[in-house]
């Protein structure tokens, strides 16, 4: 069946939900972005595998968790979005201080789950506004911790719905970057932490979240850090040194609280506003410091709003 002819019959034997022309703004932490031609919410990993096995091989795919670290353009996405948030959400305590976690589990939930099971080393996940699938994809980290320092093995799936178990040595893992995934996506991971104390870990999480609220614009729509830190420096320091705090384009504003955050002020920004401000910040920093800021955020989709 061609994708243009795909309808609800495509998932007759599936347990998930297939939505058409679905607005994506509500699925992203920036609260911007046009509609997806199709959005699928899988019931579980087996259901996801079945759905993927029936998609046309050339169908554009976008995987979306909490929608942080992503800028969906105003024209939306003309393919199929696979939503993991609220869908692939299983966490299982294993032996040897290990946890198996699915890709749609929020990083904050993972931090609390590990702490409540007297495991330490995962508290930093509480400060990451995304899912574990996204954390695996970019080796997300903060406060001295990185996701891949705990990985024992991962499960991946390809667009044919085929599932593989892979080891860390099969990937090239670096700061905010993981290479070697190919045309596959992370669907779960086995992580090994250290024995700990529940009360100590929960207090550390509480302190981390308090620090985050004090130093980041957590009460405004944002995607998390916009740029990677360059070697030996901080993106926020460079942006602030160029006098860019508070600079705005439309409703998009460089945060006064943390210069490596761009906020959607009171929900008035468009994706085009945010993208233009990202380019402006990169240009000004390059002109004044000769340093090229590299985006952490992924820009996705069609720039032009389509008439449907």
Curated annotation (Swiss-Prot):
SUPFAM superfamilies: FAD-binding/transporter-associated domain-like, Uridine diphospho-N-Acetylenolpyruvylglucosamine reductase, MurB, C-terminal domain. The active site is at 176, 225 (proton donor), 296. Disulfide bonds: none annotated. Transmembrane segments: none annotated. Its cofactor is FAD. It is an enzyme of class 1 (oxidoreductase). GO terms for biological process: cell division; cell wall organization; peptidoglycan biosynthetic process; regulation of cell shape. Signal peptide: none annotated. InterPro entries: FAD-bd_PCMH, FAD-bd_PCMH-like_sf, FAD-bd_PCMH_sub1, FAD-bd_PCMH_sub2, MurB, MurB_C, MurB_C_sf, Oxid_FAD_bind_N. Its EC number is 1.3.1.98. It catalyses: UDP-N-acetyl-alpha-D-muramate + NADP(+) = UDP-N-acetyl-3-O-(1-carboxyvinyl)-alpha-D-glucosamine + NADPH + H(+). This is UDP-N-acetylenolpyruvoylglucosamine reductase. The gene is murB.
């Amino acid at each position: 069946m061609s994708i243009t002819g795909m309808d609800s019959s495509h998932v007759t034997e599936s347990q998930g939900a297939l939505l058409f022309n679905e607005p994506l703004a509500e699925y992203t932490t920036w609260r911007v972005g046009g509609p997806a031609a199709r959005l699928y919410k899988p019931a579980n990993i087996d259901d996801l595998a079945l759905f993927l096995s029936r998609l046309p091989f050339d169908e554009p795919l976008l995987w979306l968790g909490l929608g942080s670290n992503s800028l969906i353009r105003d024209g939306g996405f003309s393919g199929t979005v696979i939503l993991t948030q609220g869908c692939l959400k299983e966490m299982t305590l294993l032996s040897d201080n290990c946890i198996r976690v699915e890709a749609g589990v929020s990083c904050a939930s993972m931090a609390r789950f590990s702490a409540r099971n007297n495991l330490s080393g995962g508290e930093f996940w509480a400060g990451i506004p995304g899912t574990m699938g996204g954390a695996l994809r970019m080796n997300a980290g903060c406060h001295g911790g990185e996701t891949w320092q705990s990985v024992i093995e991962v499960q991946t799936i390809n667009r044919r719905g085929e599932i593989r178990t892979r080891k860390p040595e099969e990937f090239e893992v670096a700061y905010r970057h993981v290479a070697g995934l190919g045309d596959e996506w992370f669907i779960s991971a086995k992580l090994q932490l250290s024995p700990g104390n529940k009360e100590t870990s929960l207090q550390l999480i509480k302190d981390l979240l308090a620090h985050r609220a004090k130093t980041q614009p957590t009460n405004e729509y944002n995607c998390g850090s916009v740029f990677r830190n360059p070697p030996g420096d901080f993106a926020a320091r460079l942006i602030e040194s160029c006098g860019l705090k508070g600079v705005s384009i439309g409703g998009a504003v460089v945060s006064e609280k943390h210069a490596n955050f761009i906020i959607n002020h009171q929900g008035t920004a468009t994706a085009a506003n945010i993208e233009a401000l990202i380019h402006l910040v990169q240009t000004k920093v390059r002109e004044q410091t000769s340093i090229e800021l590299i985006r952490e955020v992924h820009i996705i989709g069609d720039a032009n709003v389509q008439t449907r």
